[in-house]
C-alpha cells in the first residue's frame, strides 16, 4: 500500500518571459548570489511513497503533486527525476538548505503542474542494499519495474518525461532506447558520452581495479562535499554541501560501484542514434566530467530534429544543486513544455 504523507516547502517566483541567457544576466547584475536565491514561503503538497519490486529487490518510489488526484479529472503530465551515482533521490531532488532558498525540484515541478516521481535505485537510499553493482543496465531494469506502478496510479500509459542527472541521464538514455513508446521528452543533465578529455574521469579511472573488484565504494562526508568544489569554486553555496551530507549519510557512507565502473571503462554506454525521443542536452559551463566538444558530438548524432543543447553559465557538474539552479529549472521546463510542431517535413 502507498504511504501517504503531507509536508510543507517553499514557493518560488517562476522566471518567465525571458531566455536562459537573459535570466543569467539578470541574476548576475541585479543581486548577489545570496540575495538572488528563490524565495521560500509555506506551501502544502500531496505526497505518496510506493514500493516496486524487481524480483527480491525492493525499490522505493516517491511522488509529489500540488493536490491529490481526483477521480474523473484529466491526468497531469508525468515527470520522472532520475538520480546519479553518489546520491539517492530525495537528497538530490528534495533537499532543504536552511536560509538558502528553494532547492527542491519536487516542489518546483509540482508547481509547474507535473505529477512528479523519482526512484531510489538498487543499493541507494531506501531501496534494498544487495550484492549487485547497480550499474546502468540494472538501472534500466529498475525503471522498468517502476513503470506498472506509475501507470496504475496516474492512469497515464506512455509519454513520461524524464530528467536524468549525470549517470542518471545515462540510465534515462538506455531506458529510452529500449522503451521508446514509454517516454516523452527527455532532459540529459550533466551527461557523459565518450568521456574524451574528461579530467574527472581520468582521475577516477585510477581506481578502475577497485571498481572491478568491489560492488560498493566509499562515499564519505568529504566526497559529498567535494562535489561542490571539484570543478569550479563559487558555483555552489557551501551550505548546500552541509545539507546534502546531513540528508544522505543516514543511508550509509558507501554506494554501489556500477556506474563508476561503467563510466571509466565502458563509455559510450548508448549511441545517440538509438534514442528516438526529443532530447535536451544541458551542461554546466565548468563541468569537469564531459567536455562541450564531446557532448556536441553526441548531440549532432541524435536522430530526432526536436532537440536542444544548452550551456548554463556559472554552473559545474551538478546542475540540480548549483547556485544558478533556477536556470536549470527554466531551461528544462521550457523544453518539456514546448508546443508540438504544426508540421514536420
Model-inferred region functions:
Residues 141-158:
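Conserved acidic catalytic loop of the alpha/beta-hydrolase fold
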Residues 169-180:
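Short glycine-enriched nucleophile-adjacent loop
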Residues 200-282:
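Alpha/beta-hydrolase
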Residues 70-75, 79-111:
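Short, surface-exposed "cap/lid" segments of acyl-processing enzymes
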Residues 39-71:
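N-terminal cap/lid segment of alpha/beta-hydrolase-fold proteins
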Residues 288-294:
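Conserved alpha/beta-hydrolase "acid-adjacent" motif
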Residues 1-9, 22-23, 27:
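N-terminal secretory signal peptides
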